[in-house]
A protein has these predicted regions:
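Vicinal oxygen chelate
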Residues: 2-29, 39-40, 46-135, 145-167
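Short acidic-aromatic low-complexity motifs
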Residues: 32-36
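C-terminal catalytic core of tyrosine-transesterase DNA break-rejoin enzymes
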Residues: 138
Length: 167
């Protein structure tokens, strides 16, 4: 005996991308004391474009997303009651965010004008980058570089020995 049904098979739900369009597999997610102000700083210093701001009921930023170059950066306000403390509350950060740019000197000048603290001014480095180090007003450490010279692995290893051990 055969049975027939008039029910249509369930429509397949379109597949979602595990890594959404515009995201990379690693995205920094910063805790800031003053995340809205941090977004404004990153716009001035690094040319960030604001993508999203979600405010918590108490007015703090619970999620912000900006784009710098081809990469996303997520951030939110410090929420110590949830264990989310900023570098300012922790008295520092062991993490450095690296930004690769077309013109390190221009970005360095913009960041300093926007309020970044100079940790190391731009200089040509043995690995082939013109490179600088900054601290933003929210306690996050940044390295910024422009690649200026290709260096072979052998040259790089020799230069690293000389740089670290005095030759």
């Amino acid at each position: 005996m055969s049975t027939t049904t008039t029910e249509k098979p369930a429509a397949k739900k379109p597949a979602v991308q595990a890594v959404p369009e515009g995201m990379h597999t690693i995205t920094p997610h910063l805790v800031c004391a003053g995340a809205v102000e941090a977004i404004e700083f990153y716009k001035k210093a690094f040319g960030a474009v604001e993508e999203l701001k979600l405010e918590a009921p108490d007015g703090r930023l619970m999620h912000g997303r900006i784009r710098i170059g081809d990469s996303m950066l997520m951030l939110f306000d410090e929420m110590q009651e949830c264990g989310a403390e900023s570098p300012l509350a922790l008295k520092g950060s062991p993490v450095v965010i690296h930004l690769q740019v077309e013109d390190v000197d221009t970005v360095f000048a913009q960041a300093v004008a926007a309020g970044a603290k100079v940790k190391m001014p731009p200089a040509n480095m043995f690995w082939g980058d013109r490179y600088c180090c900054l601290e933003d007003p929210f306690g996050h450490q940044w390295s910024v570089a422009t690649h200026v010279e290709d260096v072979s692995p052998e040259q790089l290893q020799e230069a690293a020995k000389n740089a670290c051990c005095g030759g």
